[in-house]
């Protein structure tokens, strides 16, 4: 073949040979350039995708920190920090779903989107539980204050009378109410489940004392006793409301913790997978460039 090509070229003029040679060099140069450019573009694209996925990983970690801060401060700083990060991550995952081509990796992104949806729902539930908890706190203060005020009126009136026994009984009731408030405060400040029942028992003791005083006390004091009893019953209901909000908040936090772990796990898995894709594309581009170079050298020898 080489001899045949040499004979053919021997019949071609020098200018034509130079033109053919220059054209061949130009074609081979363009081939190498195109191969290199295509490979480089692919690697850059994969690198950009990997960088974008890494930014989502960072957002996921920021979301966890913001959620922990929200829990620690009991929502004092508001919900904007967590909600903003949820919005950013949701938008980022939608973009990632469009950027990623591999079916398995698309499935991973869908799992992240599902986890984020459940995370968002759980956070909303936790916020609502927090609002109910603070509402219960407010009721606790108002109802207890009203009960104390009504009993104090009775106590002051009896202090001016002659019945020491009745006065001491009302003083005992005041002490029971104060004991109930002490137990309830211990429960609400600690949030410990085991502190709830002692608080309820203390309230029940005060309610029983009011019932016991209904007959011995004169008729004029029974309206105050009745109002104090109603306030203590509302006080007890507020303790139960506080408990329910605590249970709801704990359940929401558990879900958020689980979904947050899924988000981080899938994000790491996606990063690893896309790194492999990038490295594979880089190796493929390198092989294409080597092939184009080898072809150029082969034509050059010919």
What is the predicted function of each stretch?
Residues 20-24, 35, 164-212, 237, ...:
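Selective recognition of signaling/oligomerization transmembrane alpha-helices
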Residues 90, 97-156, 230-254:
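Hydrophobic, ordered structural segments
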Residues 79-87, 106-114, 134-142, 167, ...:
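Short, charged, amphipathic alpha-helical segments
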Residues 37-68, 76, 80-83, 87, ...:
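Juxtamembrane membrane-water interface segments immediately C-terminal to a transmembrane helix
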Residues 92, 135-171, 209-211, 215, ...:
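Extracytoplasmic
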Residues 1-74, 119-127, 271, 275-302:
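Hydrophobic membrane-targeting segments
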Residues 86-115, 129, 154-165, 190, ...:
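Short, solvent-exposed, charged loop/turn and helix-capping segments
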Residues 56, 60-70, 109-112, 116-126, ...:
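Short, structured motif recognition centered on aromatic/hydrophobic residues
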């Amino acid at each position: 073949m080489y001899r045949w090509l040499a004979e053919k070229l021997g019949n071609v003029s020098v200018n034509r040979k130079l033109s053919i040679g220059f054209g061949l060099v130009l074609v081979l140069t363009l081939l190498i350039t195109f191969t290199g450019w295509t490979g480089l573009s692919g690697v850059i694209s994969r690198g950009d995708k990997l960088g974008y996925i890494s930014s989502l990983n960072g957002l996921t970690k920021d979301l966890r920190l913001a959620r922990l801060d929200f829990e620690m401060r009991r929502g004092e700083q508001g919900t904007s920090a967590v909600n903003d990060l949820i919005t950013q991550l949701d938008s980022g995952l939608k973009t990632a779903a469009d950027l990623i081509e591999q079916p398995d990796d698309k499935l991973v992104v869908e799992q992240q989107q599902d986890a984020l949806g459940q995370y968002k729902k759980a956070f909303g539930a936790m916020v609502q539980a927090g609002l109910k908890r603070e509402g219960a706190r407010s009721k606790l203060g108002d109802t207890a204050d009203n009960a104390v005020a009504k009993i104090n009126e009775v106590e002051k009136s009896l202090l001016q009378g002659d019945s020491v026994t009745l006065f001491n009984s009302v003083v005992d009731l005041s002490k029971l109410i104060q004991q109930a408030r002490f137990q309830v405060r211990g429960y609400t400040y600690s949030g410990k489940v085991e502190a709830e029942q002692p608080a309820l028992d203390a309230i029940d003791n005060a309610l029983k004392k009011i019932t016991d005083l209904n007959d011995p006390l004169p008729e004029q004091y029974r309206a105050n006793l009745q109002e104090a009893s109603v306030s203590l019953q509302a006080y007890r209901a507020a303790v139960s409301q506080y408990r329910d909000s605590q249970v709801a908040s704990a359940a929401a936090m558990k879900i958020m913790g689980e979904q947050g772990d899924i988000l981080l796990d899938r994000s790491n898995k996606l990063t690893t997978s896309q790194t492999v894709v990038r490295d594979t594309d880089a190796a493929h581009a390198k092989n294409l460039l080597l092939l184009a170079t080898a072809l150029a050298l082969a034509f050059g020898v010919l």
